[in-house]
Amino acid sequence: GPPIPGEVQNPIHLDRVCVRFPELKLCMIHGADPWWDIAIRLLIKYANLRIMTSAWSPKRLPESLLHYMRTRGKTKVIFASDWPVLRQSLVVPEALALELPPDVLDNYLFNNAESFFFGQETD
């Protein structure tokens, strides 16, 4: 991460923001390491919060996040490569190999980003 104290990157700091501004769309970018479980709890708690896996190779995503994606978080996780950090030719095949249900994979790779950035709700 950047040369700043790690505690300022803890997603718990979004808790108060999500409460005060429920109409504001918020997205945690670059994953949430080492606070994945806190991030998932916040994603469950707030309808206006998403997480983007930019700069994370899909094969390195924690099982807790993959489980969340398959269950309660089908619309909450957004794929991104953070190119040129990770190349599309590497991360797209890794994402396809995650053994996600087809609807969850479609949401992860496209639908969730479309909905978040452009307001297009998808099934």
Model-identified regions with their sequence ranges:
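Conserved, mostly hydrophobic/aromatic
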Residues: H30, I51, D82, L105, ...
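Mid-to-C-terminal alpha-helical segments outside catalytic/metal-binding sites
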Residues: G73-K76, L86-D123
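Catalytic pocket-lining loop regions of alpha/beta-barrel enzymes
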Residues: G1-I78
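Short amphipathic alpha-helical interaction segments
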Residues: W56-R60, M69, W83-R87, A97-L100
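Acidic-enriched, low-complexity/disordered segments with a strong bias for Aspartate over Glutamate
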Residues: D15, D33, D37, D82, ...
